[in-house]
Structure formats: C-alpha cells, structure tokens
C-alpha cells in the first residue's frame, strides 16, 4: 500500500521590505488592494469580499476602506513604511482606499492613475435602462 504523501505547510516568512507599491483595483462591484515589493511580488492583498462583504455592499467606499486597512496592516507586519499607489478602475472605493492606506500609517509618496483607456477597441456593453 502506498504511503500517504506528507503535506507541506507553507509558512509566510517575514520579508523586510521598506518601500512598496499599492495596487488598488476598483470596479463598480468590488475593490481589490494588492501591496507588492518594488519588483512586483505580492506581499499582502485584501478585497472587499475577503473582508466579509457580499453582493452590492462590496462596491461601497466603506468596504474599500476596510480592505485597504487590512492589506496595510499585513504589509506593515513585513516592515513596510512607504508606498506608491497605483489606482486602476472607475469604482467608488478609489479615494477611500488611498485615505485608509495613509490612516493606517503608510507614507504615500506617489499616486498614479493607471486605468486602461482603449484607443477605440472593444464595443462597450449596451446602456442600462432602469
């Protein structure tokens, strides 16, 4: 009989990273905050969904604020002090997430909007009639 395979437990080792990049992906339905080191390797991430929100509540500025606070705390546990913020998307949680990063104790050195804008690419979805 085959021996059962041993489960390897991955421990998140403490990375000492002083500077980082906070990527805020804000859509109408959710906000995802990923904090990476300068080369782009993820250190911490959180979203409105992982903070316990569901449905339409995920798109609110308050949900984005909690997601940014959670990601900032995890990043500060790894020794992060300053971040550059790259914001992508049209969602409601853009400014709330940036303010939450500053309030959590991270020093924001740069705020850049990297929302992709098409040069008339795909046809957009039809207008909603409510």
UniProtKB/Swiss-Prot annotation:
UniProt keyword Mitochondrion, yes or no: no
Alphabetically ordered keywords of this record: Ribonucleoprotein, Ribosomal protein, RNA-binding, rRNA-binding
SUPFAM superfamilies: Translational machinery components (SSF53137)
Cited Pfam families: Ribosomal_S11 (PF00411)
GO molecular function: rRNA binding; structural constituent of ribosome
Gene Ontology cellular component terms for the protein in this record: ribonucleoprotein complex; ribosome
GO biological process, one term: translation
Keyword GTP-binding attributed: no
Description of how the protein assembles with itself and partners: Part of the 30S ribosomal subunit. Interacts with proteins S7 and S18. Binds to IF-3.
Described function: Located on the platform of the 30S subunit, it bridges several disparate RNA helices of the 16S rRNA. Forms part of the Shine-Dalgarno cleft in the 70S ribosome.
Family named by the database record: Belongs to the universal ribosomal protein uS11 family.
UniProt cross-references to HAMAP family, sorted A to Z: Ribosomal_uS11 (MF_01310)
NCBIfam families to which the protein is assigned, alphabetical: PRK05309.1, uS11_bact
Name of this chain's protein: Small ribosomal subunit protein uS11
Gene: rpsK
């Amino acid at each position: 009989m085959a021996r059962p395979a041993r489960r390897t437990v991955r421990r998140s080792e403490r990375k000492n990273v002083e500077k980082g990049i906070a990527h805020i992906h804000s859509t109408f339905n959710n906000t995802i905050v990923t904090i990476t080191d300068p080369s782009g390797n993820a250190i911490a991430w959180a979203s409105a969904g992982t903070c316990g929100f569901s449905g339409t509540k995920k798109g609110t500025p308050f949900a984005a604020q909690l997601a940014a606070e959670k990601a900032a705390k995890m990043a500060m546990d790894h020794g992060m002090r300053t971040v550059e913020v790259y914001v992508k998307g049209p969602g409601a949680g853009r400014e709330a997430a940036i303010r939450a990063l500053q309030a959590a104790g991270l020093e924001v050195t740069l705020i850049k909007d990297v929302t992709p804008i098409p040069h008339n690419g795909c046809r957009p979805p039809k207008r909603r009639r409510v």
